[in-house]
Amino acid sequence: MYQEFFVNTAQNETSDNGIIFIYISLSVFSATIISYFIPQRFDLFYIYLLIWFGCFSIFFLIFKSKIIKSLYTIRTRIRKSTVWPTSMKIINGICWAAPFALGALIPSMHEYLILAGIGFGNISTFIIFLLNNKIKNIDQLIVGIICMISIGIIIFLYDGKVIEKSYGEFLARILISIAYGIGGIYSAIIKPE
């Protein structure tokens, strides 16, 4: 049973998120590390944009052919999601968007809400695809679970005075990068039977 759940069987489609997740992981990690060394001043905001755009662009060029190849599968999945019942679309949208919207309203909880948005969003998408389309995106489930666990990690580190609150967003981005990296590696390594 364990293997049947975590390895896609013949009746289920496989996930092709691996390269996309690895791309996201490397881009977020690189941009986060480089941004860390730039002084945090509002007048340098454009530099942050250049760093993030540059990191995503560089890794896109590195993985270009594989990303373009996997976009066909992703486009097919998006088409399948258009036939979901309206209630499921709303639930999925709320899972993705609500934490990010709250992050704008409650900046002091931004790092938790980023992780919650990615966690709830990936978990809800996994569940809905599994129920409606028989697609096992275990890599999405992995990303979601790691992001949710990461909220606890940050709380533990704050309470234990291991890190200061000012490093929370940096740590959240690193943990997001790790989550997508693990999900991407899982997807790239685990193949259907």
Language-model segments: residues:
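N-terminal juxtamembrane cytosolic/stromal segments of multi-pass membrane proteins
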Residues: M1-F21
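Membrane-interfacial loop-to-transmembrane alpha-helix junctions, especially the N-terminal start
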Residues: D16-I22, Y46, K136-V143
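Selected alpha-helical membrane-embedding segments in polytopic membrane proteins
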Residues: I22-L105
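Membrane-helix interface and helix-disruption motif detector
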Residues: Y36-I51, A101-G117, F156-A172
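C-terminal ends of transmembrane helices
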Residues: F60-R79, F126-N133, G184-E193
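Membrane-proximal helix-loop-helix units in multi-pass membrane proteins
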Residues: V83-I145
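Terminal transmembrane helical module of multi-pass membrane proteins
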Residues: I128-E193
